[in-house]
Each structure stands twice: as C-alpha cells, then as structure tokens.
C-alpha cells in the first residue's frame, strides 16, 4: 500500500449513503440476457470499486447504473433517506465524494496513523491472517445459466487459454457460433508428431479435438494419414491409412 492515506469519519444521510453505493456499483456493466459472466465498466477502474461493511444490500445488475442498489438495511432495519450514519473512508475517497457532490458533511475525525501503518500493525497482530467473509451483500438480477452446455464449452475454452474473456464485455450465448469463430486455428504439429495444443476436455470430461485444426495441419498435403489418441495426446502419422473404427452415427 504505497499511498500515505489516513482515515476520516463524516456524518452522511441515508440518501447520501445510497448515492455513494450507486456510484460504486457503476463499476459493473449492466447484465444482458445470455451473458455467461459479469463484466466491468472500463471507465471505472478497480480502485473505485468500493464495498460496504455495516450494511446489508443487494446489487441488481439487470438494471442500469444508478438504479442497482436494493434492499439496504442497517442493524436489521431498512435504510431510509433521513437516517444519519457515520461513514469511515480514507481521505482520498472523502475528497472525491465531496467534489462530486455525493456527500456534503465535513470530516469529524482523522486517524493519527496512516492506513499503511495501520495495515502493518494489524497484520503483525494477526499472523497468520485468517480473513472472514461477511456475506453482507450479493449480486442479483443475473442468470449465468451454469447448467448450459454451451456455456460450459465457452468457460473451458477460456480456462485453457483458447478464448479470451474481455474484462469489459461478457461472452454471450446469443452469439455462440460467432464466439467459437474467434478461437484461432492451431497447427497441432508437423506430420508424424504429436500435439495437444488444439485439444481440450469438454464438460463431460472426455477429450475433444477440432476437425478444422486437423485440416489446418494437413492443408496442401496429399498424404494418407492415421490419427489416434493416447496418453492425452493426438498422434498424427502419415503414409498409413486410418486404421481406427468408424464413428457411430448420432
């Protein structure tokens, strides 16, 4: 933590608190039907992505920025606009919120130690560190279709490095065929060698190999060839005809 920030406290109304929460929730993009993941607004870098302790709340990503914060409670009661809360933030965030007109109060307290020094002291006292999750907030309004086999295929391609999942835009099942077309052809190997670069394991755990990658390997060749799978590798041998069994029709 390289910045010399200190902590401030400031009184805010419930309305100001919810405005601050909406400001932070704008870090996400609005979820669209068919999105396989959530994505992030590139105009709102990660250091603006604040979370809030002491409140329970939901972030509905099916709604546009500014309308996402729902069901906010404080100490078990709904947070109303006229409630008064004590907010603790660092001096950088306080100044930004004031400049944007999100909060209006003046600081009431300032820490004598920097955030950096407080972190060092806390970590020294809690070694090993055992972080706990508050479970005080959740994302709603999304259906990631986790049981959809097409989604499983896209996730597998991302996890194996075959397909990029942009930070600022989710892959979407409505453009599934187009997304698959983004996966580059891979030349598996030279002839008479083996390779795994173009293979992947599908959602059912079985190995798969793309026919178009095999075609790319043999582009321009008139040789006979044999293809086999052994020890997690596709073996491609030329000058011998295919000696495997015919695949059954679906």
Which residues does each PLM region occupy?
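Primary recognition of N-terminal secretory signal peptides and signal-anchoring hydrophobic helices
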Residues: 177-250
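Feature captures C-terminal
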Residues: 1-180
């Amino acid at each position: 933590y390289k910045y010399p920030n200190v902590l401030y406290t400031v009184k805010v109304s419930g309305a100001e608190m919810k405005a601050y929460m909406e400001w932070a929730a704008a870090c996400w993009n609005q979820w669209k039907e068919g999105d396989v993941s959530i994505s992030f607004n590139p105009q709102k870098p990660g250091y603006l992505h604040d979370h809030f302790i002491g409140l329970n709340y939901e972030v509905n990503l099916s709604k546009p920025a500014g309308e996402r914060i729902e069901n906010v409670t404080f100490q078990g009661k709904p947070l109303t606009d006229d409630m008064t809360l004590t907010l603790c933030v660092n001096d950088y965030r306080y100044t930004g919120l004031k400049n944007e007109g999100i909060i209006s109060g003046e600081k009431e307290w300032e820490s004598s130690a920097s955030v950096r020094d407080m972190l060092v002291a806390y970590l020294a006292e809690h070694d090993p560190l055992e972080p706990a999750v508050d479970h005080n907030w959740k994302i709603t309004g999304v259906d990631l279709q986790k049981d959809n086999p097409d989604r499983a295929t896209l996730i597998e391609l991302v996890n194996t490095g075959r397909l990029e999942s942009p930070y600022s835009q989710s892959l979407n099942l409505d453009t599934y065929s187009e997304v698959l077309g983004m996966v580059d052809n891979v030349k598996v190997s030279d002839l008479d060698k083996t390779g795994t670069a173009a293979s992947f394991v599908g959602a059912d755990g079985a190995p798969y190999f793309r026919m178009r990658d095999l075609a790319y390997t043999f582009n321009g060749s008139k040789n006979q060839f044999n293809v086999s799978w052994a020890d997690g590798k596709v073996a491609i041998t030329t000058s011998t005809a295919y000696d495997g069994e015919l695949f059954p029709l679906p």
